[in-house]
């Protein structure tokens, strides 16, 4: 057998430097490196259908192949000594020096050769570790051969440690390395940002949701839903004064009402039974199950095993920083699906709260994000969405129908309805959804899916490995032989011959060889296997079940096989003693990972299903039952689980003899104490007798169904097939002798067995002696009535070693006798405990504890809220402050802020002086509000210039037409600041709210690029509503909104004013910029539009904002003039246009703290208000003069235009004449060339005629010579001529002959 292609055995250059240590200690070069000396046993690539129970056998195969490379013709190399180097993030397998000596640890052998390594891969790509309980020194791990390719196979690498205690250390070190690497991978990357920007986002208004009966929507669905919503709104307004409104904390589905309607109100009704499917996709074949997950996870999951993977992908990073909230409506009790005559379930939204959402269409899902609560309120994968629709009357509304599962096994269709700002926006949303669905479908269809059905050969191997897991080798051998009997004679003979050739020396080795050849056979048969429901209708009857003639007959065969296996497999699994000690005799997967991998399993049988689940399987189940089986039906037998299950509270059905429901068992609770005591004594006698005659006393279990008698053929079957080995029986006898002295074990066994002696009606049955085989049969006959606690409470030995028959936990209703007989108190004491006073005190205590818990929860929520607020404030103010603020200044500011609350005017000189000394970063937002209040106390805007009186919350409830421009600029605003860097995080959503509210408030300005930076600076220092008030102050009171108007007239005036300032105060710099054609609009426009926030550091921008709130718009001119004057020398040194622009945009903003403080000081000392006013008047005067001169000079301008047009035409005429002359010269040259060619042609023709005449003469001469020569000479002559023609060099040789 060739080594697996996924394992690299060739030498590669090793990136590590040589280090002297090879132990698990950090090397001197890299402190984080760890090294382990191990033996590399080998590796192999796995089939996609390989499951967990198969892995120990695969590991044993690799181990055996390395120990006996000649067995079976396998050419695998023997184990080699290696050094496993853990160097973040890589795991490298390096050949160990001195590997020829097994375990040599000489000083020379401690130096690894860094030139080569066997293989390397990243630690985070390792998906699972495998222990071998048969030999604790062996372990393995699984990894994808090509991690970047989702379709690549898994590879298994097996190692052997010198000491079993070394294995946990190695695995723990690899896991720590993997966790560290995964944290690095989890950081935002460029791909995540591209995924965010590639996703389309729209602002929508959530209208409500309606429960529908079909997954396809009629054209009038949206209009019908809107009519129902309006009807509910009218009813709500009527009772608004009488009834309290719904909780404003909910996000979706606030109030559920039942609105009567006609059948056409919603969708075409369907019968009651047609809606009870399992939520499988339309068109999916029920018998064939499509695996929606890869058999092995992509990453190491510390606390989980086979976690359910997303069908399409991991979640897009578009909502990375959003706190994901669970939909509150899903926590409520969902309404039952209605009958055809039942009314529709309508859940409109609450109009009194903010219902605007961000509708994000990603690559594989739809997210509905609430900017108000900063959370994802709805997330739906494309696979759950069945259709989308747009309104006919309400053209600005749309909706989609999706599948929801309120509880496992129950699915319903919900229609969510939304409103957009315009019809064109709805068209864009619908087009985006259509394109996204098409792209996702194309990607999904290109993905290779692993299909499994009940008849798959690999599935039968999986079931066999599950059944023999944890069994002793002799018992496993019996199970394997029974499985081999289902194969054809040729296949059995072939496997038998191959195994005998290898001469196994033990049952364990023989089992490994049989599983090896059986796996090879199953893989070969799987290639030609046709899944159920995929094969043609007419197939030969001689084939195996997967090629059966009809699906009905095949189903019957499956049920017959299940009935045949139900007795045997349960008996074999009952004999598997010692769950924690014996399940690894043949090698098992890490128990910790496996117990966690099935912790969420509730009512699904892993033993009767393929390992894959359909896409619509409930996420809480690790395995899905066969679709045609009822997991609660009596004939559905639950496998004896080999995993550790937590208690579960799922319901079960009991197969009672008289066919009554579960409530029939209630008479068991009303048995008289005398009958119970007599039953208990009879059971104890039976227990003693059975102990003396049975070799399996530990198998007594509780049984709540009536006793059954084993048929004779089953008795003979179990006597022949269920015989134990002598060693095993001796162990059981020893265990029996040891447990006979255990009083607690006797008590539990008698209490459980007493339940067997009672019938369903409550009458006692006379106990009789039964054999241990009959007891096993009684347990197997109806295992659904079995509870794990009853079996675990038999005795101390069984509780620790035997495995549960069911993962379900007992209840008081199911096991009353166990609860009754397990205590040692008398009935009088039990009655005393139930006295009313004690019960009342217990209730009082419970109520007080609950009240205390609620208070503690509220306090914890307050503490968490305050902690989150402090953390958010810390993140917001994460910038370096310019200029230190002294304690005295801080105290003075505190006093000023007290006056702010009283709205008292303060002396502006004092404020100017105090502001010059500094502003504390933590109180900056309050100080800005204080400065705004002082300005408004002195200056009052006229009524015409004041902003509309609309509250911030009311604005947020509306839709804005500027949503696209705002959403695009969210990622561009302070992209490096932690508060705004998270895509659609709290910072970006708050910024979206603020910009949206202002765009709705100021219809003239709307939204303009640059406002986002101003709003971002405000949000860093105050809340949303406070920032909105301050943004209105800046725009309306201070007049900044003029520069954002669509005509940009104010910005042109500002550019003229800045140019005049440079011309008057820095003439050399002005001339230098004019010579290089650099106008102020090239470098100063961002300064004015973003108030320096887009290019300069936040500390400097905050100080600029301090002065702006005090002095207004002229601060921008002061700062710009100070910046240019301070760097005048360096600007003058730049000689070209590109160098000057590069300096102004990149070098100038990169200042140190001292330069910033110097500029701020100059700004405080500068006063240019008069100059700015004069320049503005000058601009308007010049503008008026130009307009007047334009009217007076219209005629002269017309004449000048005509003269210019005439001169242009003359120039064009001259150009055409020159082109014409050039064309004439070209024509003449071409004509002369043509004449020359014609003369050459005539000469050539004459020469050809002459040569033809000569040729004819030569031919005549040759004919005459042929007639004169004899025939032999002619032949020799022809040969000679032929040789001469073939080899022209021979002419020279012939000519040289004498």
Swiss-Prot record:
The residue ranges of the PID domain are: 53-209, 312-468
Q: Which GO terms describe its molecular function?
A: GTPase activator activity
Q: Which residues carry this modification: N6-acetyllysine?
A: 477
- What broad class describes the main subcellular location of this protein? cytoplasm
Bias-annotated ranges (Pro residues): 608-618
User: Result of mutating residue 751 to A?
Assistant: 80% reduction of insulin-stimulated GLUT4 translocation
Alphabetically ordered keywords of this record: Acetylation, Cytoplasm, Diabetes mellitus, GTPase activation, Methylation, Phosphoprotein, Repeat
Where in the body, by tissue, does this protein show up? Widely expressed. Isoform 2 is the highest overexpressed in most tissues. Isoform 1 is highly expressed in skeletal muscle and heart, but was not detectable in the liver nor in adipose tissue. Isoform 2 is strongly expressed in adrenal and thyroid gland, and also in lung, kidney, colon, brain and adipose tissue. Isoform 2 is moderately expressed in skeletal muscle. Expressed in pancreatic Langerhans islets, including beta cells (at protein level). Expression is decreased by twofold in pancreatic islets in type 2 diabetes patients compared to control subjects.
Q: What is the effect of changing residue 972 to K?
A: Loss of Rab GTPase activation. Only 20% reduction of GLUT4 translocation; even
* Coiled-coil intervals, chain numbering: none
User: Which PROSITE patterns does this chain map to?
Assistant: PID, TBC_RABGAP
Q: What is an annotated GO biological process for this record, any one? A: cellular response to insulin stimulus
Q: Where is the composition biased (Low complexity)?
A: 672-682
Tell me which residues bear Omega-N-methylarginine.
577
Bias-annotated ranges (Polar residues): 750-765
Chain positions covered by the region annotation Disordered: 1-31, 241-287, 317-353, 586-685, 725-765
Q: Where is the Rab-GAP TBC domain?
A: 918-1112
The protein's matches in InterPro entries, at most eight in alphabetical order, are given as:
DUF3350, PH-like_dom_sf, PTB/PI_dom, Rab-GAP-TBC_dom, Rab-GAP_TBC_sf, Rab_GAP_TBC_domain
| UniProt keyword Phosphoprotein, yes or no | yes
**Which Pfam family is one of those matched by this entry?**
RabGAP-TBC
An annotated GO cellular component: Golgi apparatus
Illness the protein is tied to: Type 2 diabetes mellitus 5: A multifactorial disorder of glucose homeostasis caused by a lack of sensitivity to insulin. Affected individuals usually have an obese body habitus and manifestations of a metabolic syndrome characterized by diabetes, insulin resistance, hypertension and hypertriglyceridemia. The disease results in long-term complications that affect the eyes, kidneys, nerves, and blood vessels.
Record protein name field: TBC1 domain family member 4
**Gene coding for it:** TBC1D4
């Amino acid at each position: 057998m060739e080594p697996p292609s996924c394992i690299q055995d060739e030498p590669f250059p090793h990136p590590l430097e040589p280090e002297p240590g090879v132990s698990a200690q950090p090397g001197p070069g890299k402190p984080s490196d760890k090294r382990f000396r191990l033996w590399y046993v080998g590796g192999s690539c796995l089939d996609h259908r390989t499951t967990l129970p198969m892995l120990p056998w695969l590991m044993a195969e690799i181990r055996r192949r390395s120990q006996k490379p000649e067995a079976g013709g396998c050419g695998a190399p023997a184990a080699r000594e290696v050094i496993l180097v853990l160097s973040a993030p890589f795991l490298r397998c390096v050949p160990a020096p001195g590997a020829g000596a097994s375990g040599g640890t000489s000083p020379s052998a401690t130096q690894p050769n860094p030139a080569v390594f066997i293989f390397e891969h990243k630690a985070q790509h390792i998906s699972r570790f495998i222990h071998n309980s048969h030999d604790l020194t062996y372990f393995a791990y699984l990894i994808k051969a090509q991690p970047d390719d989702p379709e690549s196979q898994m590879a298994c690498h097996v190692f052997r440690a010198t000491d079993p205690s070394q294995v946990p250390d190695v695995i723990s070190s690899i896991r720590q390395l993997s966790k560290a690497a995964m944290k690095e991978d989890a950081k935002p990357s460029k791909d995540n940002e591209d995924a965010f920007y590639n996703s389309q986002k729209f602002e929508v208004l959530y209208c409500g949701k309606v429960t529908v009966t079909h997954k396809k929507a009629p054209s009038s669905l949206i209009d019908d839903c809107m009519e129902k919503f309006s009807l509910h709104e009218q009813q709500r307004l009527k009772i608004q004064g009488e009834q309290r409104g719904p909780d404003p904390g909910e996000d979706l589905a606030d109030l559920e009402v039942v609105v009567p309607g006609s059948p056409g109100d919603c969708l075409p009704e369907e019968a009651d039974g047609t809606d009870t499917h399992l939520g499988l996709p339309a068109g999916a074949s029920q018998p064939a199950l499509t695996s929606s997950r890869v058999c092995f996870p992509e990453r190491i999951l510390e606390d989980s095993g086979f976690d359910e993977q997303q069908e399409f992908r991991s979640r897009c990073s578009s909502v990375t920083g959003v706190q994901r909230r669970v939909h509150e409506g899903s926590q409520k009790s969902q309404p039952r699906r209605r009958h055809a005559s039942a009314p529709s379930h309508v859940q409109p939204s609450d109009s009194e709260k903010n219902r605007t959402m961000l509708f994000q269409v990603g690559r594989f899902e739809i997210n509905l994000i609430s900017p108000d609560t900063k959370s994802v309120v709805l997330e739906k994968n494309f696979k759950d969405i069945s259709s989308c629709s747009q309104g006919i009357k309400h053209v600005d509304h749309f909706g989609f129908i999706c599948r929801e599962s309120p509880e496992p096994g129950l699915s319903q269709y919900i229609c969510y309805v939304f409103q957009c700002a315009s019809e064109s926006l709805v068209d864009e949303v619908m087009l985006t959804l259509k394109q996204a669905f098409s792209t996702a479908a194309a990607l999904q269809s290109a993905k290779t899916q692993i299909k499994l059905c009940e008849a798959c050969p690999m599935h039968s191997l999986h079931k066999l490995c599950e059944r023999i897991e944890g069994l002793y080798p002799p018992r496993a051998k019996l199970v394997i032989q029974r499985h081999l009997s289902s194969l054809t004679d040729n296949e059995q003979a072939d496997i038998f011959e191959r195994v005998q050739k290898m001469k196994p020396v033990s049952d364990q080795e023989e089992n490994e060889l049989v599983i090896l050849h059986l796996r090879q056979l199953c893989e070969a048969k799987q290639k030609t296997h046709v899944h159920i429901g995929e094969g043609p209708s007419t197939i030969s009857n001689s084939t195996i079940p997967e090629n059966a003639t009809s699906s009905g007959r095949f189903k019957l065969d499956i049920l017959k096989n299940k009935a045949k296996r139900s007795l045997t497999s349960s008996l074999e699994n009952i004999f598997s003693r010692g769950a924690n000690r014996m399940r690894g005799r043949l090698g098992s997967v890490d128990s910790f990972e496996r117990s966690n991998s099935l912790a969420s399993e509730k009512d699904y049988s892993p033993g009767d299903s393929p390992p894959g689940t359909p896409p619509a399987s409930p996420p809480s189940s690790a395995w899905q039952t066969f679709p045609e089986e009822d997991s609660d039906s009596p004939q559905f037998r639950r496998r004896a689980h080999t995993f550790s299950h937590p208690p579960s509270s799922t319901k079960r059905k009991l197969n009672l003899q008289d066919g009554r429901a579960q409530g029939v068992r209630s008479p068991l609770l009303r048995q008289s104490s005398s009958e119970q005591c007599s039953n208990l004594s009879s059971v104890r006698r039976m227990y003693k007798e059975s102990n003396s005659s049975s070799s399996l006393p530990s198998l007594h279990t509780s049984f709540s169904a009536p006793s059954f008698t084993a048929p004779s053929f089953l008795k003979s079957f179990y006597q022949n097939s269920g015989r134990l080995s002598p060693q095993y029986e001796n162990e059981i006898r020893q265990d029996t002798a040891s447990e006979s002295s255990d009083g607690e074990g006797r008590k539990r066994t008698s209490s459980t067995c007493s339940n067997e002696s009672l019938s369903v009606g409550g009458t006692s049955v006379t106990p009789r002696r039964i054999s241990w085989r009959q007891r096993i049969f009684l347990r197997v006959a109806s295992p659904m009535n079995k509870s794990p606690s009853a079996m675990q409470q038999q005795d101390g030995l069984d509780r620790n070693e035997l495995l549960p028959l069911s993962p379900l936990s007992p209840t008081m209703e199911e096991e009353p006798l166990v609860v009754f007989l397990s205590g040692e108190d008398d009935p009088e004491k039990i009655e005393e405990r139930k006295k009313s006073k004690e019960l009342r005190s217990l209730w009082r205590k419970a109520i007080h504890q609950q009240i205390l818990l609620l208070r503690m929860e509220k306090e914890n929520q307050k503490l968490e809220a305050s902690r989150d607020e402090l953390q958010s404030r810390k993140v917001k103010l994460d910038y370096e402050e310019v200029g230190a603020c002294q304690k005295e200044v801080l105290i003075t500011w505190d006093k000023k802020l007290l006056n702010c609350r009283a709205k008292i005017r303060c002396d502006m000189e004092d404020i100017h002086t105090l502001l010059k000394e500094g502003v504390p970063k933590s109180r900056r937002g309050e100080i800005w509000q204080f400065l705004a209040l002082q300005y408004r106390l002195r200056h009052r805007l006229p009524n015409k210039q004041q902003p509309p009186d609309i509250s911030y919350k009311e604005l947020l409830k509306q839709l804005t037409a500027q949503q696209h421009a705002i959403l695009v600029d969210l990622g561009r605003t302070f992209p490096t600041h932690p508060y705004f860097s998270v895509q659609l995080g709290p910072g970006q959503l708050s910024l979206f709210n603020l910009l949206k509210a202002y765009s709705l408030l100021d219809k003239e300005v709307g939204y303009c690029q640059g406002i986002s930076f101003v709003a971002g600076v405000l949000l860093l220092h105050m809340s949303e509503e406070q920032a909105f008030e301050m943004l209105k102050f800046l725009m309306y009171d201070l007049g900044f909104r003029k520069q954002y108007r669509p005509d940009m007239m104010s910005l042109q005036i500002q550019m003229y004013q800045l140019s005049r300032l440079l011309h008057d105060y820095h003439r050399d710099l002005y001339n230098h910029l004019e010579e290089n054609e650099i106008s102020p609009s090239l470098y100063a426009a961002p300064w004015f539009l973003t108030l320096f926030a887009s290019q300069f550091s936040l500390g400097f921008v905050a100080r600029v904002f301090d002065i702006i709130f005090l002095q207004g718009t002229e601060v921008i001119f002061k700062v710009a003039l100070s910046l240019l004057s301070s760097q005048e020398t360096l600007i003058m040194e730049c000689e070209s246009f590109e160098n000057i622009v590069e300096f102004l945009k990149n070098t100038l903003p990169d200042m140190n703290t001292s330069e910033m403080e110097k500029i701020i000081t100059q700004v405080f000392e500068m006063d240019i208000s008069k100059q700015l006013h004069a320049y503005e008047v000058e601009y308007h005067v010049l503008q008026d003069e130009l307009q007047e001169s334009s009217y007076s000079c219209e005629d002269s301008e017309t004449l000048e235009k005509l003269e210019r047009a005439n001169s242009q035409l003359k120039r064009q005429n001259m150009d055409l004449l020159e082109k014409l002359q050039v064309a004439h010269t070209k024509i003449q040259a071409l004509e002369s060339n043509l004449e020359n060619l014609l003369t050459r042609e005539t000469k050539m023709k004459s020469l050809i005629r002459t040569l033809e005449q000569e040729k004819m003469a030569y031919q005549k001469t040759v004919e005459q010579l042929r007639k004169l020569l004899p025939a032999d000479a002619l032949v020799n002559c022809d040969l000679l001529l032929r040789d001469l023609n073939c080899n022209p060099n021979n002419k020279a040789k012939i000519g040289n002959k004498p």
